[in-house]
Design a protein with these regions (language model features):
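HIT superfamily nucleotide-processing domains
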Residues: 1-111
């Protein structure tokens, strides 16, 4: 998508602090971290949000990436995955992305 910041990051047009990349996904540190370990896991193919995804294998792959990145960051013993969907769900960028949060004790409910 032409004006999508995550599409531009995925294509390399905009730099990011990458922690993972393959042909389907990229993971990079969030610019406004909410935890010591806060990484965004983003499919390279543009989907506005999770309701647009019709590829179960891709969603499974994104979960595997999350697990791998959590291990890489040393937070596999405790982390949270969050997918905000739509404006009311707190989605700020209209490109599906998964927040991986860890590195400290996380509270529940989150808000």
């Amino acid at each position: 998508m032409e004006n999508c910041i995550f599409c531009k990051i995925a294509s390399g047009e905009i730099p990011s602090k990458k922690v993972y990349e393959d042909d389907k996904a990229i993971a990079f540190y969030d610019l406004e971290p909410q935890a010591p370990g806060h990484v965004l896991i983003v499919p390279k193919k543009h989907y506005d949000n999770v309701t647009m995804v019709d590829d179960g294998a891709l969603m499974g792959h994104l979960m595997q990436v999350a697990s791998s990145v959590a291990e890489q960051l040393g937070i596999k013993a405790g982390f949270r995955l969050v997918i905000n969907t739509g404006k009311d769900g707190g989605q700020s960028v209209n490109h599906l992305h998964i927040h991986l949060l860890g590195g400290r004790e996380l509270q529940w409910p989150p808000g």
